[in-house]
């Protein structure tokens, strides 16, 4: 389960000594005479990492404490609450003790922070990057390096779904038959209408087919970002545009498909459509406790869903992922694969802190402790050549992505990375989507926010 305390911690303490993030120690070190990782000698400088991913908070805290214990280098980590990273980054960068390591999500963000991003061309994290396309450039300058390679789609409980397939009257007899939107919707409709029957037959605790589609700040990005990616991707593809850089104007050609998927999510769920923005829903827990069969999210959910401390009933063997079938090229479609997690180094930091930060990141991707934490505790797929053998991904969702790619399916690019003024555009889309779903607005309002809002924000972002 994601760390719900993170947002409280951010409100109460944004100081550089705060420990609530993607990595960090549980307290500052009083010693500066430890030994650096590898062949480094005296411990100098300090590290302040501003983490993007709340669900990895605990693992990063433990990892950074280990590093401090080994080297004497003080590591402070702060994790932004869901949907609040840009706001938090702006606030922290304005402080005297600003982050030395921060995340940029795409080329537009890298452009925004170009005065702060150090050239990483001659660093270990770039040298070890297996696919150099997973680095962002500003001209010839390498401004950030991907720290994980992620996929998202529709998480599903394969144990329950396979059990359903064996029941009389099931829409399909095998999960493999679910390879397009129409079939997925027919299955979801049937499951949602037969919850009690399924529970009696399988001994399950189902309440719905799809986990709640929350539209609060902690969840809405799944739809204004990740589901919205689908119509963007297919339109960019049709237009011959760069799939991750996008184009200044869109027509909303595939928004009817977006509507069909969204309506399925909300109609085949037990959540009241009028309360989706309440913040009271927990889709992860619904899937984790076996109450839902389907849950749109990414491979970063594997670690919290399988962490025994969270008390969920699902196991790793129960979990898999299928594409967000969109009714366009379903039979050839894979998962959505990419990243919005790029490490950048603050070139305005003191040189000793820059050096300490680069050493810390190198240790994270080369040491046993670092690789174990990233692969196993965080459940991430790292894009570095050091992650072999025991440190290859054990994430069932990443494995599903690899299997689809091996079968010749086409991965969907993360076209949402092209979103101009991303927070503003998404907020307007979410507002319209919330009103539509609650019966207080029209779908035309969603289209307007999506299409006209894109043009408006693109013009503002590019000063046209």
Question: Where in the sequence are the language-model features?
Answer:
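Conserved N-terminal structural module of periplasmic/extracytoplasmic solute-binding proteins
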Residues: 4-8, 22-109, 125, 328-330, ...
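C-terminal motif of bacterial Sec signal peptides marking the signal peptidase cleavage site
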Residues: 17-21
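Short helix-initiation/N-cap motifs at beta->coil->alpha
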Residues: 79-88, 179-183, 275-289
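Hinge/lid segment of periplasmic solute-binding proteins
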Residues: 104-156, 162, 200-205, 318-325, ...
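Extracytoplasmic/periplasmic solute-binding protein
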Residues: 141-147, 152, 182-244, 292
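Glycine-centered hinge/linker elements that transmit conformational signals in sensory
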Residues: 188-189, 238-277
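Extracytoplasmic/periplasmic substrate-recognition and gating elements
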Residues: 310-379
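C-terminal capping/gating helix-and-loop segments adjacent to ligand/active sites or protein-protein/ligand interfaces
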Residues: 337, 380, 386, 400-456
């Amino acid at each position: 389960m994601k760390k719900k305390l993170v947002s409280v911690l951010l409100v109460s303490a944004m100081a550089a000594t705060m420990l609530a993030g993607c990595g960090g120690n549980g307290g500052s070190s009083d010693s500066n005479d430890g030994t650096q990782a590898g062949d480094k000698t005296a411990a100098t400088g300090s590290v302040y990492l501003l983490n993007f991913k709340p669900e990895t908070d605990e693992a990063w805290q433990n990892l950074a404490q280990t590093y401090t214990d080994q080297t004497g280098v003080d590591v402070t980590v702060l994790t932004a609450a869901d949907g609040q990273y840009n706001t938090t980054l702006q606030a922290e960068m304005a402080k005297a003790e600003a982050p030395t390591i921060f995340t940029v999500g795409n080329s537009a963000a890298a452009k925004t922070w170009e005065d702060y991003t150090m050239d990483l061309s001659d660093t270990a994290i770039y040298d070890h990057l297996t696919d150099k396309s997973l680095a962002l450039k500003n001209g010839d300058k390498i401004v950030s390096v991907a720290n994980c390679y992620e996929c998202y789609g529709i998480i599903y409980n394969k144990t329950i779904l396979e059990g359903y397939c064996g029941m009389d009257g099931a829409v399909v007899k095998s999960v493999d038959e679910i390879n397009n939107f129409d079939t997925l919707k027919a299955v979801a409709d049937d499951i949602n209408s037969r919850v009690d029957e399924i529970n009696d037959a399988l001994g399950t605790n189902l309440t719905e087919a799809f986990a709640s589609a929350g539209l609060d700040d902690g969840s809405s990005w799944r739809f204004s970002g990740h589901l919205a990616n689908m119509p963007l991707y297919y339109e960019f593809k049709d237009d011959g545009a760069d799939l991750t850089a996008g184009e200044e104007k869109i027509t909303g050609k595939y928004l009817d498909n977006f509507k069909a998927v969204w309506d399925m999510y909300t109609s085949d769920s037990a959540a009241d459509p009028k309360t989706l923005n309440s913040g009271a829903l927990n889709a992860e827990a619904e899937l984790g406790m076996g109450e839902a069969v389907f849950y749109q999210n990414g491979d970063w959910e594997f670690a919290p869903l399988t962490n025994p401390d969270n008390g969920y009933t699902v196991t790793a063997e129960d979990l898999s992922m299928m594409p967000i079938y969109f009714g366009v090229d379903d039979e050839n479609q894979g998962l959505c694969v990419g990243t919005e997690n790029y490490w950048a180094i603050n070139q305005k930091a003191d040189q000793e802190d820059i050096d300490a930060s680069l050493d810390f990141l190198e240790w994270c991707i080369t040491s046993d402790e670092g690789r174990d934490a990233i692969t196993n505790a965080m459940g991430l797929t790292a894009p570095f050549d050091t992650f072999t053998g025991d440190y290859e991904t054990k994430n069932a969702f990443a494995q599903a992505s690899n299997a689809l790619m091996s079968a010749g399916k086409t991965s969907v690019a993360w076209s949402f990375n092209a979103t101009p003024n991303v927070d503003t555009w998404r907020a307007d889309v979410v507002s319209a989507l919330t009103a539509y779903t609650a019966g207080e607005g029209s779908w035309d309002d969603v289209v307007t926010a999506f299409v006209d809002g894109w043009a408006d924000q693109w013009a503002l972002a590019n000063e046209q």
